[in-house]
Swiss-Prot record:
PANTHER family documented for this protein: SUCCINATE--COA LIGASE [GDP-FORMING] SUBUNIT BETA, MITOCHONDRIAL (PTHR11815:SF10), SUCCINYL-COA SYNTHETASE BETA CHAIN (PTHR11815)
MF terms in GO: ATP binding; magnesium ion binding; succinate-CoA ligase (ADP-forming) activity; succinate-CoA ligase (GDP-forming) activity
Pathway the protein acts in: Carbohydrate metabolism; tricarboxylic acid cycle; succinate from succinyl-CoA (ligase route): step 1/1
Gene from which the chain derives: sucC
Gene Ontology CC: one annotated term: succinate-CoA ligase complex
Enzyme Commission no: 6.2.1.5
Record's protein name: Succinate--CoA ligase [ADP-forming] subunit beta
Residue ranges constituting the ATP-grasp domain according to the UniProt record: 9-236
Classification of source organism: Archaea, Methanobacteriati, Methanobacteriota, Stenosarchaea group, Halobacteria
Residues that bind substrate: N256, G313, I314, T315
Recorded catalytic activity of this chain's protein: succinate + ATP + CoA = succinyl-CoA + ADP + phosphate; GTP + succinate + CoA = succinyl-CoA + GDP + phosphate
Keyword DNA-binding: no
Heme keyword on record: no
Length: 382
């Protein structure tokens, strides 16, 4: 579960990590009211889960009331990379002299948490990692002991952070790690940490991703789950209990098991397509659950074809087939072509049940993916 910036900054503030003064607004008048209560200039920032908000027009600076109103009117309701902006964070703009990067995640190759610090903040850190990996200092942490103060200081000094702010940056590094560990997060990131003209340090942005499977022991985040959902599709996925990730492509993908779905995503890409989503219906899925999954994928207007990849173990092929038929029979006209690959338990029975007038059945996964990609390409041409 990824928190919005405003949610992450609330968590940061509670953890003692300095952030600019800010407040959330859901209307133009409310945004202006917040801006007037702060010290100008202010930044008006779209609250959507996309990168590059500034370049896409989702972040604007305002020097006065009129500009704050103009910025809010421009951002609220805009379509930002496929997402409608329905709320903005209004915060005091920071007069900065330098931008840094601080982040914590799990390094799976080392089997340990890793703290990352860089002087090159304010830019895409993935690009820095590719072009100049030496510019990112990495400090691995023994989770049995947690991040020690000397490790935080070493990371900051090794990154070349200016000495007069190094101590404050080290405190932020320590705070970010402690927050990552205490909240069962998969990633906590500040990009950038801004060094102000008065030589203070503040978290000008905030990224926080939580392990959804650990939310049962994180009651403090329970109230944030619904608001953290980006749109109706994510909210619907939460309601149905699906593991769902929306992507930027046009080939919808439904499978039973994370590994199977990931394999299907890779094959869609291999055959020249673009995955529209990750959707795992889980093991033992009954007909109604399959129907819900298909209805959800159809709800994404970017989807031009759908591929089912089902390998029956606990999940029976005949139950999946009934669910597909049930979902498709609700439509006077099928929104997009549907391709199905069934294998495993009761797969033969499932293929017999499937309505050939509604779906295309393929024997192999490769054949199913290629057919789905072809259908998506045809829809694009039309």
């Amino acid at each position: 579960m990824k928190l919005h910036e405003y949610q992450a900054k609330e968590v940061f503030a509670d953890a003692g990590i300095p952030t600019p003064e800010s407040a959330l607004a859901t209307s133009v008048d409310e945004a202006v009211e917040v801006a007037d209560a702060l010290d100008y200039p202010v930044a008006v920032k779209a609250q959507v889960h996309v990168g590059g908000r500034g370049k896409a027009g989702g972040i604007k600076l305002a020097e006065n009331t009129a500009e704050a109103r103009e910025a809010a009117e421009s951002i609220l309701g805009m379509d930002l990379k496929g997402y409608t902006v329905d709320r903005v964070l209004v915060e005091e703009a920071v007069d900065f002299t330098n931008e840094l990067y601080v982040g914590v995640t799990m390094d799976r190759s080392e089997g340990a948490p890793v703290v990352m610090v860089s002087e090159r903040g304010g830019v895409d850190i993935e690009s820095v990692a590719e072009e100049a990996p030496e510019d990112i200092v990495r400090e691995h942490v023994d989770p049995s002991f947690g991040l020690q103060a000397y490790q935080a200081r070493n990371a900051v000094y090794d990154a070349g952070i200016e000495q007069d702010v190094a101590g404050d940056v080290a405190k932020i590094v320590q705070g970010v790690y402690d927050l990552w560990a205490d909240s069962d997060a998969t990633e906590v990131e500040i990009n950038p940490v801004m060094v102000t003209s008065e030589r203070d340090v503040v978290a000008a942005d905030a990224v926080m991703k939580l392990d959804e499977d650990a939310l049962f022991r994180q009651p403090a985040f329970a109230d944030m789950e619904e608001d953290a959902a980006e749109d109706d599709l994510e909210a619907k996925a939460n309601e149905y209990g699906f593991d769902y990730v929306r992507l930027d492509g046009n080939t919808g993908i439904i499978g039973n098991g994370a590994g199977l779905v990931m394999t299907t995503l890779d094959l869609v890409d291999y055959y020249g397509g673009q995955p529209a989503n990750f959707l795992d219906i889980g093991g033992g899925a009954k007909a109604d659950r399959v129907a819900n999954a298909l209805d959800m994928v159809f709800s994404d207007e970017n989807v031009d074809s759908v591929v089912f990849n089902i390998f029956g173990g606990i999940t029976r092929g005949d139950e999946v087939a009934k669910g597909i038929n049930s979902a498709l029979e609700q439509f006077d006209e099928i929104p997009t072509p549907v391709v199905v690959r069934l294998a495993g338990t009761n797969a033969a029975e499932g293929r017999e049940i499937l309505n050939d007038d509604l779906v295309t059945v393929e024997e192999t996964l490769e054949g199913a993916v290629q057919r789905a990609v072809e259908y998506a390409d045809e829809e694009d041409i039309q």
